[in-house]
């Protein structure tokens, strides 16, 4: 029996939440893949502010992962805060890069607690603040602040997976002619 080679997807992170979200998102949309997480530099602050900085972090992660791993696709996921009125909304941006083209997707967003947003704006990484509030060590590699705030009804993996699926929309065969 002939063995088919799985498409390899590199993830610009070693965070198990991001790696599993990429695997689930790709398999739901494009079928079986082998996912490899690699440590890369995002080139942005530890907690990006604004769509552009967050997007740039995801793009850098994807491109840097593509350079490190022989793969079909490379994925970068970056969480960041966007200001809406006087509120700060946490979103995840995913970039899928194939060596030539990139596609982009965003997760749904949620309002960051004011006390957390203020500390992030002072330069403190959101994950550290979330650990203090929740008492959960490495919360960003687990349920995330969203998981804590929603009693696990929505977790960080859900947001990451959602951003991956959104970034894969242009890569679906039925949609290719639209992009």
Swiss-Prot record:
Keywords: Hydrolase, Magnesium, Manganese, Metal-binding, Nucleotide metabolism, Nucleotide-binding. Its EC number is 3.6.1.73. It catalyses: XTP + H2O = XDP + phosphate + H(+); ITP + H2O = IDP + phosphate + H(+). Binds 1 divalent metal cation per subunit; can use either Mg(2+) or Mn(2+). The keyword Cell division does not apply. Mg(2+) binds at residue 70. It is an enzyme of class 3 (hydrolase). Pfam families: NTPase_I-T. It comes from the Archaea. InterPro entries: ITPase-like_fam (IPR029001), Non_canon_purine_NTPase (IPR002786), NTPase/PRRC1 (IPR026533), YjjX_NTPase (IPR050299). Substrate binds at residues 13-18. Its cofactor is Mg(2+); Mn(2+). Phosphatase that hydrolyzes non-canonical purine nucleotides such as XTP and ITP to their respective diphosphate derivatives. Probably excludes non-canonical purines from DNA/RNA precursor pool, thus preventing their incorporation into DNA/RNA and avoiding chromosomal lesions. Belongs to the YjjX NTPase family. PANTHER family: NON-CANONICAL PURINE NTP PHOSPHATASE_PRRC1 DOMAIN-CONTAINING PROTEIN, PTHR34699. Homodimer. This is Probable inosine/xanthosine triphosphatase. It comes from Methanocaldococcus jannaschii (strain ATCC 43067 / DSM 2661 / JAL-1 / JCM 10045 / NBRC 100440) (Methanococcus jannaschii).
